Structures are given as C-alpha cells and as structure tokens.
C-alpha cells in the first residue's frame, strides 16, 4: 500500500491522453451501482467529449457493464482494467473520483482519493460518504441513484475555478486526517507517503 506521490507516474498502458479522466473503483456489483456511472458518462460525453472513464475492480456485473457500454456506443471511452494492486497511479492522474454506491460502509477509497488530492463526487448514500464529504465544501454529493443530480454536481465540478477546486481538495484531505474511525490505520498519511 505504500506509494510515492508521483503525478508523473503515467498510465502508459492506456492509449489515451492523461487528462480528462474520471475514475471509479470498487467491486463491479449492484451495490456499487456502476451502471448509473456508465449511463451518466454517456451524457457527460455530449458536453465533454474528451473524457475517458476508468473502472478498477472485478465482479459479477462486469460483462453486463461492458455490454451496456457497447449498447451506448461508448466502449472506446471506457477502460475496464480489473483489480489493480496500485490504484494510486490512477487516482493521481484522474480529474475526479466518482463513487456511485447505493449504500456504503465508510468508504476507504474516498480516503485514498482525498489523500491523492483527487476531487471526489459521491452519491449521498447511507453510511460513509456524508461522514467525510460536505457537498460543495470538500467535494460534491449527489442524490443517491439519481443520474440527473449526478450530472448537476459534475457540471458544478467542471464550472469550478482552479482555486475553488484546490480548496475543496485541501479541505477533503484535512477532513480525512480528522476522520478518527480510521485512526487504527496509524494515520493514512504515514502509510501513504504524500508531499
């Protein structure tokens, strides 16, 4: 789990420009609701055609999600990369991390994204995300299982200034440091070496 913060550690195996990346991480299951993300991503591409979506994880819905991407004719914009030992190089190169879960335990992956200074857009699902994120302050929360509200929050993200996004990232990282439930990890900051 130890990594050095290297923004320059590129995702060389992908034949895409290393910007305009959205990342989703988790088991490809109903709970994680990646179907919502894929359907929303189709609409994102209408406004922001240079984006790509990276999904990290395995699960019983993988084939169905790949078929949905083909049905929507966006399969060339989505990379299903399976389980990855090192998610950090993806988080460090992403514009934003999106969590679309229908329900969630306090999300460890949200903490990882915040410590990588990756902007977070998350469903306001039961447990977890709203214990860490305050919408508009240190990230963006959208109504659970609501594509329209997700797209609204994504537009807020895109319309934010660099200074506003920098402040949100800083406050998210600060909140993670105060998040006592994960104190038994001896502070993620000491495990995940960041500048």
PLM feature segments, named:
Residues 20-46, 53-56, 60-66, 108:
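A conserved mid-protein helix/loop that constitutes part of the nucleotide-sugar donor-binding site
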Residues 181-195:
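C-terminal alpha-helical cap of glycosyltransferases
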Residues 66-82:
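Nucleotide-activated donor-binding/catalytic signature segment of Leloir-type glycosyltransferases, i.e.
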Residues 83, 102:
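Aromatic "clamp/platform" in nucleotide-sugar-dependent glycosyltransferases that forms part
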Residues 1-14:
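Acidic anion/phosphate-binding donor-loop and adjacent secondary structure
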Residues 163-178:
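A short, well-ordered alpha-helix in the C-terminal region of glycosyltransferases
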Residues 119-123:
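Short hydrophobic beta-strand element within catalytic cores of glycosyltransferases
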Residues 134-136, 140-147, 155-162:
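Conserved acidic donor-binding segment of nucleotide-sugar-dependent glycosyltransferases
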